[in-house]
Structure formats: C-alpha cells, structure tokens
C-alpha cells in the first residue's frame, strides 16, 4: 500500500449516506445526475505531511482511534486496483486490474471534521483489503457480473449480518460509466465543501501510475445501522461469486471458520 494512492467514492449506493448520517455533509455538493456519486475523497497520500500520509491499511486488525469518544462504523465496499495513464497533467485513462472486498471504516461523530477525508484515516489500521481477484474486463460480460458483496460482525459468540448482501451491479455507477465519472472527478474536482482538489493531490504525489479506489459502501442491515465497533469485534467483508455460492453457504463458512477458495475475496479484521 505504501507505493500507491488510496481514494474512496462517496454516495455510490442508494441511501447509504442517509443511513450513515452523512447526507447533510454533501448538501452543498450538486450533481448533474441525481443518481451520481457525490465525490471522491483521499484516505492515503504517499509522502503527505498530513495525517493522510499515514499508511492506514492493516488486513488483520482494525485499530480504533485514541479518542475513545469517537464512534467507528464498518463500511463494506469493493476496492479496485487501477492503472493510471496521464496526458498533459490530466488523467487520460483508468484501467481496473483487480478487485477485492474492502473495509472503509469511518468516524461517525467527529464534529470538528470539515473534510470527509478527516473521518477516514484515523489509525494505522483504519482500512483493510481482502485477497485480490483479477479482472478480465471491467464491463458487461466480465467477472464482476457474477459477484455480490456481504459483510458480517462477530461479537463474542454472535454473528450478525452487518451490511446488505448486494450484487456489484447494484452500484449506482459501475463499469464504463463509473470509470468516466472517476476520470472526470480526478481531473476537475475542486476544493469545495467536504471535498478536496484531486488534481493537486495527483500532482503533489508525482502522478502515480497506480491507485486503489473504493467504489462506495452498501446499505446497512437493521442490526448494523447503529452498531459501532468495539475492541474484540471481528469484521468480515466478503465478495463472492453468486453463481457458485449462495448467501447461506457463505454465512455458514464464516460462522464455522471454513476455508473458502481464492475466488472469494475475504477480509477478516479483529478490532483493537
């Protein structure tokens, strides 16, 4: 992770922002399409002197912030590892190479935060990524057609479904539409409201040729909507081929600790 940038997309799954209590944060952000995501935020910038320079991915543990008054919530997402190509200081093309389950855990009650990024990188283990799966083509007919995302939280002997089980095709923007939107945002997003100027970030990072971008969190199940993370909890985010596995078989595998094939992307993080 130390060689790349980490970005995330806000508002790419209907009703997630409302559930997370973040809709008001984006009230000043206007979009041409009512279904469009709200914007892109950084969660890691290599070499930055700010908190965003802290390598915040740990695939085994999620470290809560030192301030114990802050509420942290899991955000189950899909991450894309992408190759970037530039022309005249602008992003020319984005090529997704791999995808994986991702936890974009976020602070929910930091009233001092003025940018969405300030809620994202709160410790050396505020993010986690599962085993990565090769993308044959990021378009209809490709491998992502067959994948769904689900998340669980284990607390003592109880396992709850934290986020809805959702097909990747359920993202508001996906495939070519998503890539065109990301390219536009990377080139034109300005420092406004809770968002930041992304072209400046790319320039200051010497135009990296690779990035991880998380493409939006799913909606929460009722049990996960107001359940904040506590030490000892175990977070699971799972991306699976729904033509080969159903939800009950994935749930039982997580519950029983059964081994699943590498074609299933699994993130398991113990909260500390």
List each language-model region with its residue ranges.
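Loop/turn positions that initiate beta-strands
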Residues: 208-210, 230-234
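Glycine-enriched loop-and-adjacent helix/strand subsegments that border the catalytic/binding cleft
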Residues: 2-203, 227, 249-271
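Glycine-rich beta-strand-to-loop/alpha-helix junction loops that act as flexible
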Residues: 9-11, 209-222
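Short, charged beta-turn/beta-strand-edge "cap" motif at the junction between a beta-strand
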Residues: 14, 217-223, 240-245
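Catalytic nucleophile loop of clan PA
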Residues: 223-229
């Amino acid at each position: 992770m130390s060689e790349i940038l980490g970005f995330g997309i806000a508002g790419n799954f209907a009703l997630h922002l409302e559930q997370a209590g973040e809709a008001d944060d984006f009230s000043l952000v206007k979009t041409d399409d009512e279904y469009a995501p709200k914007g892109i935020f950084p969660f890691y910038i290599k070499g930055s002197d700010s908190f965003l320079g802290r390598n915040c991915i740990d695939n085994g543990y999620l470290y809560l912030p030192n301030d114990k008054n802050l509420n942290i919530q899991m955000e189950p997402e899909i991450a894309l590892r992408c190759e970037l190509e530039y022309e005249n200081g602008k992003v020319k093309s984005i090529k997704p190479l791999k995808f994986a389950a991702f936890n974009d855990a976020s602070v929910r009650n930091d009233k001092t935060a003025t940018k969405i990024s300030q809620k994202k990188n709160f410790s050396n283990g505020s993010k986690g990524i599962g085993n990565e799966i090769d993308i044959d083509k990021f378009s209809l007919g490709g491998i992502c057609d067959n994948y769904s995302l689900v998340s669980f939280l284990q607390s003592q002997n109880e396992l709850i479904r934290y986020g809805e089980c959702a097909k990747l095709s359920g993202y508001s923007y996906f495939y070519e539409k998503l890539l065109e939107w990301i390219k536009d945002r990377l080139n034109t997003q300005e420092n406004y409201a809770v968002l930041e100027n992304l072209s400046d970030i790319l320039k200051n990072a010497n135009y990296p040729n690779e990035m991880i971008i998380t493409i939006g969190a799913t909606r929460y199940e009722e049990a996960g909507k107001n359940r904040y993370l506590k030490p000892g909890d175990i977070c699971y985010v799972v991306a699976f081929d729904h033509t080969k596995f159903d939800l009950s078989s994935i749930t039982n595998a997580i519950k029983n600790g059964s081994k699943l094939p590498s074609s299933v992307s699994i993130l398991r993080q113990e909260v500390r």
